[in-house]
Regions:
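Acidic, serine/threonine/proline-rich low-complexity intrinsically disordered regions
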Residues: 201-208, 259-273
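Short amphipathic alpha-helical segments embedded in low-complexity Lys/Glu-rich regions
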Residues: 90-94, 235, 264, 298-304
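Catalytic lobes of large eukaryotic enzymes
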Residues: 269-284
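Extended amphipathic alpha-helical segments with heptad-repeat/coiled-coil character used for oligomerization
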Residues: 295-313
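C-terminal and inter-domain tail/linker signature
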Residues: 230-231, 281-283, 292
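Acidic catalytic cores of enzymes that act on phosphate-bearing nucleotides/polynucleotides
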Residues: 293-295, 326
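GST superfamily/GST-like fold recognition
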Residues: 237-262, 285
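GST-like domain detector, emphasizing the conserved glutathione-binding G-site
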Residues: 2-233, 312-454
Length: 454
């Protein structure tokens, strides 16, 4: 194909900047570079209202796929702690820099580096330790939000410890459910143990012991959430605190993996009725821009979970599992086909802001009274989404083309070592013969995204 018919990337960048959404995103990008502006997963500096250079540096993963880095960043953003940020590859996605390994030989993320008065550097690992120290070093007396009970609040600390232990119990049940083969279903019906013994095939009402254990543990979490007047674990605050962040990064991954591998949609009408507190808690998170900046979609999670935790095992409610996995993989004939549907049946997009607030404002899109965007004009929202996608692609299109061209016939795999996520191999070379064509196709796509028409 002709590689000259499509407009150049520089022309496309100019076209993107001329749109209302692109102009707003350019301005926001400039603010972020100074440490201010809205939350962003790849920010290297957060100053908020401070003008001083931070003396602490957080090392975390690039994409926000590490749940422990994610919960740490959520506390930093909610509490507005000035901090330097360095992005380091997770073990599954590439080598860690020698400079980082010299400071943190284990390679663990996140890691906090604190500059001491004598010039030495103190290294702190483990997300919960980092979060507790950050809260202690930035007290309410200096205008920061409280993230933990006060020292004299013994009742609050007892509640925090109980909830933290429950989170570990929930995590354990999730691992048992998703990353191990399921045993026979419990119950006397045709799908249960008796059905297996008698050879009769079965319905979906019975469930395995691991599924029951997971749902029973979720019921304990539900009780804790519904015991407070607001959506959060500690009802005396009108914002999420550290225990909410400890939970949400893994609950987010539970939602995706349970739907994909087990056919369990915890956000469906059925489970909203069973777990109203959990769903109200998730709804509240999904209206907060700092959470959405680090939140991933279901497809991303079911791809990034196996390199970190191991493969998921199919099971659970089989008919629903097939339905959800095909939807998430784009193989249901609808979810990845043009014209794209306005919303996603498994992971609705408009419970909170689907784009950065600056982009929505530039597009003239306002939230509903409840903070959702469910009544927004679909065509207006689609145009804003296209323009943001065009803005992102135009700013990095040549690199996207080279990355995509690694899938060509002569694309080189890394002969020296392998990583847990082979598609993210940083050493794999593109098939140079197809780079110009791939680049041209992407420029045509970008131009289409930036058009004003439908």
């Amino acid at each position: 194909m002709s590689t000259t018919a499509a407009e150049s990337w520089s022309t496309l960048q100019s076209a993107s900047s001329s749109t209302a959404v692109g102009s707003a995103l350019n301005n926001e990008q400039s603010l972020r570079a100074t440490g201010k502006g809205s939350p962003f997963v790849q920010s290297n500096l957060r100053l908020f209202n401070s003008s001083e250079k931070p003396k602490i540096t957080l090392y975390r993963d690039h994409a926000g796929w590490c749940p422990y880095c994610q919960k740490t960043m959520l506390l930093i953003e909610e509490k507005e702690i000035p901090i330097n940020i360095e992005l380091v590859a997770m073990r599954s996605y590439g080598d860690k820099p020698a400079e980082f390994l010299n400071m943190v030989p284990s390679g663990l993320l996140p890691a906090l580096i604190v500059e001491q008065p004598d010039g030495r550097k103190r290294v702190i690992t483990e997300s919960q330790v980092i979060m507790e120290l950050l809260d202690r070093w930035h007290p309410t007396s200096e205008g920061y939000k409280a993230m933990l009970p006060s020292e004299e609040d013994t009742v609050g600390w007892s509640k925090f410890d109980t909830l933290a232990n429950l989170e570990r119990e929930l995590f354990s049940w999730w691992c048992t459910l998703v990353f191990r083969p399921e045993g026979p279903r419990l119950g006397g019906g045709s799908g249960g143990l008796m059905g297996m013994l008698t050879g009769k095939g079965g319905g979906e009402k019975e469930m395995s012991g691991s599924m029951k254990g997971f749902l029973d543990c979720l019921s304990k979490v539900e009780s804790a959430l519904t015991s407070t007047p607001g959506p959060w674990f500690f009802g005396e605050y009108d914002y999420p605190t550290m225990i909410d962040f400890i939970y949400v990064s893994h609950v987010e991954r539970m939602l995706a993996s349970a739907a994909y591998w087990k056919g369990l949609d915890l956000r469906s009408a059925e489970y909203k009725a069973q777990f109203p507190g959990l769903n109200a808690w998730l709804d509240a998170f999904e209206k907060r821009e700092c959470y959405l900046a680090f939140k991933s979609d279901y497809y991303t999670h079911v791809m990034d979970i196996p390199p970190q935790y191991g493969p998921g095992f199919d099971g659970g409610f089989e008919d629903k599992r097939k339905e959800f996995s095909q939807c998430i993989n784009g193989r249901d004939g609808k979810s990845w086909k043009l014209p794209l549907p306005h919303d996603d049946p498994v992971q609705p997009l408009y419970r909170g802001p689907p784009l950065p607030l600056c982009a929505l404002s530039a597009a003239g899109i306002e939230s509903d009274a409840d903070g959702t965007y469910e009544s927004t004009n679909p065509e207006q929202m689609a145009k804003a989404c296209r323009h943001m996608a065009g803005w992102k692609l135009s700013s990095n299109g040549d690199k996207v083309a080279r990355f995509a061209a690694r899938g060509g016939v002569d694309g080189a795999k890394n002969p020296r070592k392998s990583f847990g996520a082979p598609l993210a191999d940083p050493y794999a070379n593109p098939d140079q013969s197809v780079v110009p064509s791939v680049d041209a196709v992407l420029r045509i796509v970008c131009a289409a995204l930036l058009e004003d028409g439908e």
